[in-house]
């Protein structure tokens, strides 16, 4: 009898179901919930998140240095960077406008009885927002945050933008050395990169356990009762995310001769993992690895993916625009066209460059709502369902960043079509065989 092997996607799905069942039980049995959550489930979930954070920085640095040293052309790198930022700005602006449009059409906040809504303490987000605003966050603030004063400190804090900036400079400096001096160090960084990808595969074996624990904690703490009063908001956010992924990104992919549906099938493991953990970082190493295998050069993949985690959060910006209009409708505030334009422009700035901030979507909303006169207290009403919405928007962030790599590779005429087709046959062939079993 053959040994039955389940793919990572099936293992994570099974872990999600078990986590939901256990969390549902614990939600109504508070006597056993507190001890299990504090002593077993939360630590088990935190271990997985810590493992992911442990491998992200070495992978980003090593792949960027290898990729940039391989390019060795500052002008070419500047061109890639400019195209990447332009693409990110256009796509996230489309996400903001789509979110505001859908919220105005479907009116998720209209007719909601505020007395039936539970509130959650958001003081921790308010203090974070004050810290971000006091640091002059904006275009110049973001530019200033690119340059690290201490790269070791930035690595310890996981600050992605300074790490990218340093790695690019280091790669350019390395590429200018004579080959006899350059190649040994490039070989070292290439070995580090390959080793860290092996470590990633080891960490992924623990993913089902981490997912089980994280889902169980979420359901145990919030249950499902908090969803019903906000069902229109939850459904609209999920519809908007599906629409953006399949239609908006689908059109972008088609214009580039790609298929977003094939991309989603290739990323099925990563999407399930990102959705269940609500963490984009959990799949960053595998996105870099898969997009390289799918035909994008390492010089583009290693730059676009980590940069996208700060500038191309499609799911987050889509959610933020819907949430802003929802809160306005909740309070009966009818925003004018001019106020909505201000909202779009404000979100275009505030949603960039603070990906490392805890509760980033809430921080962005707190920094944005006041600009159009929307009460900040309204965020307390949606904080209880934020985890559920965070799972969906994280999955869209993953698809958006993966597609961005392929778009920039196509734009630079560096996309390897033969390699991509071979990878499609390999991955989708395995997918079809698994489905038949």
Curated annotation (Swiss-Prot):
Gene Ontology MF annotations:
amino acid:proton symporter activity; transmembrane transporter activity
Among the Pfam families in the record, one is SDF
Question: Which PROSITE patterns did the record assign?
Answer: NA_DICARBOXYL_SYMP_1, NA_DICARBOXYL_SYMP_2
Q: Name one GO cellular component term.
A: plasma membrane
Is the keyword Membrane assigned to this protein? yes
Per the UniProt topology annotation, the Periplasmic ranges are: 27-50, 106-159, 232, 314-324, 383-387
The protein's matches in InterPro entries, at most eight in alphabetical order, are given as: GltP (IPR034703), Na-dicarboxylate_symporter (IPR001991), Na-dicarboxylate_symporter_CS (IPR018107), Na:dicarbo_symporter_sf (IPR036458)
Q: What GO terms in the biological process aspect are recorded for it?
A: dicarboxylic acid transport
Activity regulation details: Glutamate uptake is inhibited by L-cysteate and beta-hydroxyaspartate. Inhibited by the uncoupler carbonylcyanide m-chlorophenylhydrazone (CCCP).
Keywords attached to this entry: Amino-acid transport, Cell inner membrane, Cell membrane, Membrane, Symport, Transmembrane, Transmembrane helix, Transport
Q: Which domain of life is it from?
A: Bacteria
Cytoplasmic compartment segments: 1-5, 72-84, 181-210, 254-292, 346-361, 409-437
Question: What is its biological role?
Answer: Catalyzes the proton-dependent, binding-protein-independent transport of glutamate and aspartate.
PANTHER family, A to Z: PROTON/GLUTAMATE-ASPARTATE SYMPORTER, PROTON_GLUTAMATE-ASPARTATE SYMPORTER
Give the family per the record.
Answer: Belongs to the dicarboxylate/amino acid:cation symporter (DAACS) (TC 2.A.23) family. GltP subfamily.
Q: What is this protein called?
A: Proton/glutamate-aspartate symporter
Species of origin: Escherichia coli (strain K12)
Phylogenetic lineage = Bacteria, Pseudomonadati, Pseudomonadota, Gammaproteobacteria, Enterobacterales
Q: Which gene encodes it?
A: gltP
């Amino acid at each position: 009898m053959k040994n039955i092997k389940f793919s990572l996607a099936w293992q994570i799905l099974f872990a999600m179901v078990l986590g939901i069942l256990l969390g549902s039980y614990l939600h109504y049995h508070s006597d056993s919930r507190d001890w299990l959550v504090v002593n077993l489930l939360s630590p088990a979930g935190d271990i997985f998140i810590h493992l992911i954070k442990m491998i992200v920085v070495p992978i980003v640095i090593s792949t960027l240095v290898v990729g940039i040293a391989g390019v060795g052309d500052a002008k070419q790198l500047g061109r890639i960077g400019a195209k990447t930022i332009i693409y990110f700005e256009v796509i996230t602006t489309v996400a903001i406008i789509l979110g505001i449009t859908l919220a105005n059409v479907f009116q998720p906040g209209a007719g909601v009885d505020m007395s039936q809504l539970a509130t959650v303490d958001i003081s921790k987000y308010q203090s974070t927002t004050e810290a971000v605003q006091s640091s002059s966050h904006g275009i110049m603030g973001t530019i200033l945050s690119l340059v690290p004063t201490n790269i070791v400190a930035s690595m310890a804090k996981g600050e992605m933008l300074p790490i990218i900036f340093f790695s690019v400079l280091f790669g350019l400096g390395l590429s200018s050395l004579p080959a006899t001096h350059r190649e040994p160090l490039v070989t070292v960084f290439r070995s580090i990169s390959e080793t860290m990808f092996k470590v990633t595969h080891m960490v992924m074996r623990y993913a089902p356990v981490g997912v089980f624990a994280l889902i169980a904690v979420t359901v145990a703490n919030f249950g499902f009762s908090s969803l019903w009063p906000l069902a229109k908001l939850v459904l609209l956010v999920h519809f908007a995310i599906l629409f953006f992924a399949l239609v908006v990104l689908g059109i972008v992919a088609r214009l580039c001769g790609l298929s977003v549906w094939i991309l989603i099938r290739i990323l099925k493991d990563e999407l399930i993992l990102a959705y269940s953990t609500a963490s984009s970082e959990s799949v960053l190493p595998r996105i870099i690895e898969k997009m390289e295998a799918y035909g994008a050069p390492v010089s583009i993949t290693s730059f676009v993916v980590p940069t996208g985690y700060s500038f191309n959060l499609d799911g987050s910006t889509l959610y933020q625009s819907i949430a802003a209009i929802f809160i306005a409708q909740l309070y009966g505030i009818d925003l004018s066209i001019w106020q909505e334009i201000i909202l779009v422009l404000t979100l275009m700035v505030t949603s960039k460059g603070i990906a490392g901030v805890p509760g980033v979507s809430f921080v962005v909303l707190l920094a944005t709502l006041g600009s159009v006169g929307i009460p900040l207290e309204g965020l307390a009403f949606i904080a209880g369902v934020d985890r559920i919405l965070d799972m969906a928007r994280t999955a869209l962030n993953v698809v958006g960043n993966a597609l961005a790599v392929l778009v920039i590779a196509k734009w630079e005429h560096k996309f390897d079509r033969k390699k991509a087709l071979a990878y499609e046959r390999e991955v989708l062939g395995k997918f079809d065989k698994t489905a038949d079993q």
